[in-house]
């Protein structure tokens, strides 16, 4: 075979493809005339040496052409490989060299064969060349040889004749065959040279002809139509699949499929379900049918359809069949590397060649010229094999081939002729490799061939083996027809060619299944074919792991011994599974079906892996943690070991391919059984023991719940069975029949036997009858017991129905449906809370913005801000300063009073007021926010409480289950169910008076309520109605109560809303409940004695419930008759005990409810008190509003009397001087009185103390300040209350001087006051503010005189407003009667001492003494003074008569921060939140003193220490005597008398202090800093000692005289601007830094 194919066979084999594909007849015609040329070929071949020298160059060209042509050759290679060249794939190269041997003689072929495939290497240099490629391209391939010789012809003309002869069929010398040769050349134009250009298109077409290559490397999609897709959809999906698929892959990876599926826009959960359905192979990748299913499901999901849980059977079958088709047609990944890249695509051409060779053998025999082409075809196939080995040994064969070519040169001429004529030698080489070797040794035969043509005959004779080789080549016989040697060669050719060709075809057929066999796709566990490269090292591992017969320990494998570069798939191959099963069976000697851990350790440790790896492998193999491995799990473990030994890592989780089918099926079965059990486990209500019955019915009801096999029931038995008739008759018939049936006269022994049997049967029947009678007796007894039990139950039910509290027992708690409804409503309301809170916050923001806008509108100023949002810029300030300077100069020129200081401070005033108002608004908004947050928290906590009460507990669930069982007959026997229904019917048919009588006491009469409580529970009954009748209303009322409490704590009232909804306040519940409720709540101790005979359970006492105060004895007699109504005493059954337990539980509930009612009552009382306090505040607010209106009217009247007011100023100045002189002596006496009073003061608070809490109980200030005057007095006693600028919580209530000092003060200044003058003076002082009523700007007025006059009057009021009025402040100071000014006194209505008007005048007169407005900026507006109507201030009543203190404080709060005379918005806001400004702040006091009511008779200014505005922080703690008799911080409660109390107070800050005429000492404390306050510090009645007082500026001598002169003249006074009046509202006003 080798020799034949290698040398001479090249051309014949090459001719075979030609004959197959292109026709043999023309070639035969060419060959016959060319036979002579073959003889001449040796001469041409004599130059092969040169030809060889030339061939390398031609070979390089041919190589270049071969490389692209190799693809075409691949299709032709397999036949050669299968014919025997598979073992020697390079034979093709040798065959190429066959051309050389062909030329040189058989011996040359022997030489080439000797090289052993060195000729393979050599021939590529010569014929390894393109002949392969050219022949492949032509599949005539012939001209490859022709063309190469043609290339060689230029070098050797004789050699040219050889090629043409070699072309054999296209020789150039023969003119007649030249045309066919040209045709062959054109066919062979596929080869390298110019003539091959027209043939290149076949080259490209042939690679495509190798269509199998596109199937392997491309995408293989069967032409199968999927029924669930339309044709367009399937085509579109196929195109999309091909585009997304990487080259060389058949399945779309998970990542790429995910990217495509994500384009659908479906959620990941839906895509996950679609992936689980589409990935039928569980490989993590999608073949085309799976991809089509995924796209189909995505389309359905996009349309809105739901993704099914499972695919339909139709889709499953179509997809699985298509997946199988793809799997069978895709070559196994392991088999690809086994063959060269050219081997696979040659499959189809090989088949074609084989088929053609098989079908045309006869034709080949007829036409040897075609056989000549066959020789070319065989040359074809070797050349193809050369191309296979070509990349590896292309150049080397050329180099080594030079040697044989030289040998051919030695005797080339005749051997070439003999070779050309005698193809038989070439055939003889094909017969086997051994002859080739012998040829190699024999160089002498080569010489004999060279001697002459005789050797040709010898070749023929020696060609007997060659004839055997050439038996397969029938065409050679045709060629040899003209030549006897050729005929012999051809005859010998036939059989060998046939034998050679047959294995080729069959061998190639065997390779096809190898390519298609890898049907095992991922997931097919244990059914994967063995990879083509085998399982390296598996036998070694098997030998190592098998148990040793000797029992000696086996040496462990080295860890890396089995590691190779082998490909080991995840799935277990069949052969591998068999090996693992063998190892398993060898170790499982007990045939237990499993290997325990110890045995597994012995096996696995022999693999050489470390312990950690083996642990991981065991964990993966034993997922259920059984501690042993069955056969499949053992195979998994071994496969993992094998993979790891081959270099693969151990996975973290078992891939789907390795999950054993047994475990899958078992887990599925277990899950299915569990689902069955779960589905049937929840069914209750029917008893499965149907033999139990109270009726005695012996018939057993058949149903599907219970099945019991009856062994005696055999079903149908055929009568035709032998032996069965007699036994059946004997058992069913009579004895006579038995005898007759026994047949033919039974013997006596048989009759005796029958008698004994019948006797036994009779005895059994008797025993059965006795048992039945015994059973009937037992059943009858049970029936009687059941009947008795029924009667007892009926009696108990009757007693329950008759009992007044039957509603409680029948309706214990709300039903589950009602609870669920309440829970839903509660959740719904809770969900609305955030939205409501958000709306309230938004409204709060709007309110704050509106307040700021209102402030800007009501407080116009010359200092207009030009910045964003009306902000004042530096340019605005500069302009205001320049304007103020200009006014000062004008005043100096005109001789008017200077207003430079006030104008200069105008911008600071406005900014301070704006800042104050802004902070106030922000604080108010923050407070509201906090209140809203508190409400939210309270509602949430209330919701949690209610939900916890409504939520069912485990006990309630169990109780409800028992209740439903015994009341609704759920889950009981049929008889019991009927009995329960009968009880229910009797209960409903019984008249209702009993229930009415039971419900009546629950709601009303005390005569029945008490007996019921004593009889049933021994406790009070008020909870009965709430527990059983209307629990829903109770829960609602409780929720309302809690909400009202929390809102009341925040100062919000919701009582009207609650009443509007029909819910009575919690405190009204005890009154509305039965009259017996209150006595029972008051004293369960009295009610319990009557209950003790029936139920001896002191549950209420033991649970720690406090015994109520008293019980109504009238109800006790009524309780005794009801005792017998309770459970009968003679019943000692468990029912009584259960009943007692229920009643005890009821008593506990009632006790808890009583406690709750008591707490609710207390809270309601507190709420009422708070409500009263709030109403009082509202009343005061209304009064203040009326007072403001009165003042406004008085001011309007006073405008018409401005001239008279100017004249009155002189009188006021005189009055001020008189008051000033009186004041000089008054302080000297007042301190002595104060000093004398401390001992009395210490005793007087004790009797007044009891009345203080009652008076202050409704005061929200006391509640916010931890309630009561004690808390208010504590800071004062500690010396910390003297700072009015601290937080309101620390010093809110301000202590007032003792009544003794107040009584003395009016006596010292009994000077009468003209009310008209005072009114006019006040009107002038308030001119600036009252002008605001017309929404004008006082600064815009041109009347400078009025401006100065108002300003001077305001300045005087600020300087001297606190000279005498501090005495009048005591009644509302809220402090007890004590000499200590820091103590708190009970509130009293404001008194009107006669000194107050004079003091006011003095203050006005003293205001003229201020050197200038710069040292004393204007005070806050006067109309904002908290002044009650004149009717409320006739005199100061006793401390015990004092009404609540707060009314005075809120009034000041409302009015002080309102620019207009009446500001209802601020009044209301401050009334709601009036707990932030301390009562004794100097701001309030100065306001209160500076503006007494105008419309009232001449009462003095209010004496109450008014609270500061809500949002305005108090001034700094530097003025201890600002109208409130507080000592400065750090002074003990009874401070020593100030030595200089006889003198009027000096002006504050830089303003010079005034010495009283007569050298009176200076007043105690100075006022706030001048930039903030223009008013001097008011004198404190109990001022500190001189050492404790802050320093004062030096007094200016003569200041009083100058000031009084100005006041008398009235020319330098000017109207005070509204900004100046409110200067004290600034949070930094009056701050004194210690």
Curated annotation (Swiss-Prot):
Membrane topology: Peripheral membrane protein
Bias (Acidic residues): 1130-1139, 1331-1345
Family annotation (InterPro entries): DUF1720 (IPR013182), EF-hand-dom_pair (IPR011992), EF_hand_dom (IPR002048), EH_dom (IPR000261)
Listed Gly residues bias regions: 1-11
CDD domains: EH
Compositional bias annotation for Pro residues: 1387-1396, 1414-1423, 1494-1503, 1530-1551, 1559-1581
Subcellular location: Cell membrane; Endosome membrane; Cytoplasm, Cytoskeleton, Actin patch
EH domain location: 233-322, 576-665
Protein name: Actin cytoskeleton-regulatory complex protein PAN1
Species this chain originates from: Yarrowia lipolytica (strain CLIB 122 / E 150)
């Amino acid at each position: 075979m080798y020799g034949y194919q290698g040398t001479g066979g090249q051309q014949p084999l090459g001719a075979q493809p030609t004959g197959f594909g292109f026709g043999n007849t023309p070639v035969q015609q060419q060959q016959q005339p060319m036979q002579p040329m073959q003889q001449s070929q040796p001469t041409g071949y004599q130059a092969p040496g040169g030809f060889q020298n030339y061939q390398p160059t031609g070979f390089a060209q041919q190589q270049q052409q071969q490389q692209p042509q190799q693809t075409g050759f691949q299709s032709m290679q397999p036949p050669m490989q299968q014919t025997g060249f598979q073992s020697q794939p390079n034979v093709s190269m040798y065959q190429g060299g066959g051309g050389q041997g062909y030329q040189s003689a058989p011996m040359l072929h022997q030489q080439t064969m000797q090289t052993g495939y060195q000729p393979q290497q050599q021939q590529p240099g010569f014929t390894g060349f393109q002949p392969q490629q050219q022949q492949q391209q032509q599949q005539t391939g012939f001209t490859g040889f022709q063309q190469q010789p043609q290339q060689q012809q230029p070098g050797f003309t004789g050699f040219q004749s050889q090629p043409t002869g070699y072309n054999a069929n296209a020789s150039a010398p023969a003119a007649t065959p030249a045309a066919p040769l040209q045709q062959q050349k054109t066919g062979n134009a596929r080869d390298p040279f110019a003539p091959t250009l027209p043939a290149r298109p076949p080259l490209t077409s042939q690679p495509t002809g190798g269509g199998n290559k596109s199937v392997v490397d491309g995408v293989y999609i069967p032409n199968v139509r999927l029924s669930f897709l339309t044709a367009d959809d399937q085509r579109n999906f196929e195109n999309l699949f091909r585009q997304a698929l990487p080259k060389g892959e058949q399945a779309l990876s998970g990542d790429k499929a995910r990217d495509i599926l994500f384009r659908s826009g479906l959620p990941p959960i839906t895509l996950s379900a679609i992936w689980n359905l589409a990935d039928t192979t569980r490989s993590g990748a999608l073949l085309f049918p799976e991809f089509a299913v995924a796209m189909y499901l995505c389309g359905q999901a996009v349309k809105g359809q739901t993704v099914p849980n499972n695919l339909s059977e139709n889709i499953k079958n179509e997809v699985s069949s298509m997946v199988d088709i793809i799997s069978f047609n895709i070559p196994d990944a392991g088999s690809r590397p086994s063959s060269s890249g050219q081997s696979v695509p040659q499959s189809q051409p090989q088949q074609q060649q084989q088929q053609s060779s098989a079908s045309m053998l006869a034709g080949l025999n007829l036409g040897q010229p075609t056989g000549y082409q066959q020789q070319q075809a065989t040359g074809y196939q070797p050349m193809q094999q050369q191309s296979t080995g070509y990349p590896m040994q292309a150049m080397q064969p050329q180099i080594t081939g030079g040697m044989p070519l030289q040998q051919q040169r030695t005797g080339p001429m005749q051997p070439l002729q003999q070779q050309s004529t005698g193809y038989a030698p070439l055939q003889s080489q094909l017969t086997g490799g051994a002859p080739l070797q012998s040829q190699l040794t024999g160089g002498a035969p080569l010489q004999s061939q060279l001697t002459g043509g005789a050797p040709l005959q010898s070749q023929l004779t020696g060609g007997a083996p060659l004839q055997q080789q050439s038996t397969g080549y029938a065409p050679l016989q045709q060629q040899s027809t003209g030549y006897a040697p050729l005929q012999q060669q051809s005859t010998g050719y036939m059989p060998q060619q046939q034998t050679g060709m047959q294995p080729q075809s069959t061998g190639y057929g065997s390779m096809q299944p190898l390519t298609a066999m890898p049907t095992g796709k991922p997931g097919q566990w244990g059914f994967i074919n063995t990879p083509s490269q085998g399982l390296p090292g598996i036998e070694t591992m098997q030998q190592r792991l098998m148990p040793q017969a000797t029992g000696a320990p086996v040496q462990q494998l080295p860890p890396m011994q089995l590691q190779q570069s082998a490909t080991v798939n995840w799935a277990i191959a069949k052969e591998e599974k068999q090996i693992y099963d063998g190892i398993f069976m060898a170790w499982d000697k007990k045939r237990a079906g499993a290997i325990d851990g110890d045995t597994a350790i012995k096996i696995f440790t022999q693999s050489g892996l470390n312990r950690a790896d083996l642990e991981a492998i065991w964990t993966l193999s034993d997922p259920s943690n059984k501690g042993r491995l069955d056969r499949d799990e053992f195979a998994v473990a071994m496969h993992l070991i094998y993979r790891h030994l081959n270099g693969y890592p151990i996975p973290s989780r078992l891939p789907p391919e390795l999950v054993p089918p047994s475990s899958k099926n078992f887990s599925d079965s277990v899950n299915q059984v569990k689902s069955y059990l779960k589905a049937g486990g929840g069914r209750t209500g029917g008893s499965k023991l149907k033999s139990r019955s109270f009726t005695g019915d012996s018939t057993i009801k058949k149903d599907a719940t219970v099945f019991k096999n009856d062994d005696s029931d055999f079903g149908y038995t055929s009568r035709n069975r032998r032996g069965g008739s007699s036994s059946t008759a004997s058992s069913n018939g009579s004895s006579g029949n038995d005898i007759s049936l026994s047949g033919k006269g039974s013997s006596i022994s048989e009759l005796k036997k029958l008698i004994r049997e019948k006797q036994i049967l009779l005895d059994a029947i008797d025993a059965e009858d006795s048992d039945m009678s015994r059973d009937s007796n037992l059943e009858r007894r049970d029936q009687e017991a059941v009947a008795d039990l029924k009667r007892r139950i009926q009696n108990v039910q009757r007693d329950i129905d008759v009992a007044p509290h039957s509603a409680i027992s029948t309706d214990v708690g709300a039903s589950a449906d009602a609870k669920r409804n309440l829970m839903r409503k509660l959740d719904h309301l809770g969900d609305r809370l955030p939205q409501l809170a958000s709306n309230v916050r938004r409204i709060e923001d709007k309110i704050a913005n509106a307040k700021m806008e209102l402030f800007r509108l009501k407080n116009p100023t010359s200092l207009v801000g030009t910045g964003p949002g009306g902000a004042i810029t530096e340019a605005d300030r500069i302009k205001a300063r320049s304007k103020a300077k200009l006014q000062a100069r004008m005043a100096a020129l005109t001789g008017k009073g200077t207003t430079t200081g006030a104008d200069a401070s105008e911008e600071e005033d406005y900014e301070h007021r704006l800042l104050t108002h802004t902070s106030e608004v922000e604080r108010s908004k923050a407070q509201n926010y906090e209140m809203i947050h508190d409400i939210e928290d309270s509602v949430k906590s209330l919701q949690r409480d209610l939900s916890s009460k409504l939520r069912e507990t485990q006990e309630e669930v169990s109780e409800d289950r028992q209740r439903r069982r015994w009341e609704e007959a759920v889950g009981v026997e049929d008889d019991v169910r009927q009995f329960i229904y009968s009880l229910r019917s009797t209960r409903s048919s019984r008249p209702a008076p009993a229930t009415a009588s039971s419900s009546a006491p629950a709601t009303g009469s005390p005569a029945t309520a008490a007996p019921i409580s004593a009889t049933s529970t021994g406790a009070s009954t008020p909870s009965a109605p709430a527990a059983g009748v209307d629990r829903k209303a109770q829960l609602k009322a409780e929720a309302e109560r809690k909400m009202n409490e929390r809102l009341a704590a925040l100062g919000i009232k919701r009582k009207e809303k609650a009443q509007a909804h029909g819910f009575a306040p919690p405190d009204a519940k005890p009154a509305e409940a039965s009259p017996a409720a209150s006595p029972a709540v008051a004293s369960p101790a009295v009610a319990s004695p009557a209950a003790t005979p029936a139920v001896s359970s002191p549950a209420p006492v033991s649970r720690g419930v406090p015994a109520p105060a008293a019980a109504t004895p009238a109800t006790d007699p009524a309780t005794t008759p009801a005792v017998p109504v309770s459970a009968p005493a003679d019943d000692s059954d468990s029912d009584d005990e259960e009943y007692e337990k229920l009643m005890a539980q009821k008593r506990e509930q009632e006790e808890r409810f009583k406690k709750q009612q008591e707490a609710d009552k207390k809270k309601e009382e507190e709420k009422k008190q708070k409500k009263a306090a709030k109403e009082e505040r509202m009343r005061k607010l209304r009064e203040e509003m009326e007072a403001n209106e009165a003042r406004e009217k008085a001011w309007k009247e006073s405008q018409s009397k401005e001239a008279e007011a100017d004249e009155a100023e002189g009188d006021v100045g005189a009055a001020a001087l008189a008051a000033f002189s009186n004041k000089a002596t008054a302080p000297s006496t007042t301190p002595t009185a104060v000093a004398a009073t401390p001992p009395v003061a210490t005793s007087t608070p004790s009797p007044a103390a009891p009345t203080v809490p009652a008076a202050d109980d409704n005061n929200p200030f006391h509640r916010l300040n931890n309630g009561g005057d004690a808390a208010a007095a504590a800071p004062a006693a500690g010396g910390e209350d003297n700072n009015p600028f601290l937080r309101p919580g620390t010093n809110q209530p301000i202590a007032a001087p003792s009544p003794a000092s107040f009584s003395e003060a009016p006596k010292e200044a009994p000077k009468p006051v003209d009310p008209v003058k005072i009114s006019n003076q006040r009107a002038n002082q308030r001119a600036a503010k009252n002008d605001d009523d017309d929404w004008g700007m006082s600064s815009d007025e041109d009347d400078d005189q009025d401006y100065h006059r108002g300003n001077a009057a305001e300045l005087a009021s600020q300087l001297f407003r606190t000279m005498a009025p501090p005495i009048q402040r005591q009644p509302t100071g809220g402090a007890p009667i004590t000499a200590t000014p820091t103590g708190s006194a009970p509130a009293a209505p404001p008194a009107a001492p006669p000194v107050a008007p004079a003091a006011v005048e003095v203050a006005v007169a003293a205001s003229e003494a201020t050197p200038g407005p710069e040292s004393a900026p204007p005070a806050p507006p006067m109309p904002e003074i908290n002044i009650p109507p004149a009717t409320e201030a006739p005199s100061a009543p006793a401390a015990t008569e004092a009404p609540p203190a707060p009314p005075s404080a809120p009034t000041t709060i409302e009015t002080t921060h309102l620019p207009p005379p009446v500001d209802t918005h601020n009044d209301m806001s401050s009334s709601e939140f009036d707990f932030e400004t301390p009562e004794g702040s100097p701001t309030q006091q100065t306001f209160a003193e500076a503006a007494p009511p105008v419309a009232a008779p001449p009462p003095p200014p209010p004496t109450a220490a008014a609270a500061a505005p809500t949002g305005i922080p108090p001034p700094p703690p530097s003025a201890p005597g600002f109208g409130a008799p507080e000592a400065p911080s750090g002074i003990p409660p009874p401070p020593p008398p100030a030595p200089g109390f006889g003198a009027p107070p000096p002006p504050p800050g830089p303003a010079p202090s005034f010495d009283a005429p007569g050298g009176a000492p200076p007043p105690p404390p100075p006022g706030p800093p001048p930039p903030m306050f223009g008013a001097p510090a008011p004198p404190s009645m109990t001022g500190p000692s001189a050492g404790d007082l802050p320093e004062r500026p030096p007094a200016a001598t003569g200041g009083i005289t100058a000031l009084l002169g100005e006041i008398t003249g009235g020319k330098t006074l000017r109207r005070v601007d509204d900004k100046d009046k409110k200067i004290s509202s600034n949070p930094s006003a009056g701050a004194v830094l210690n």
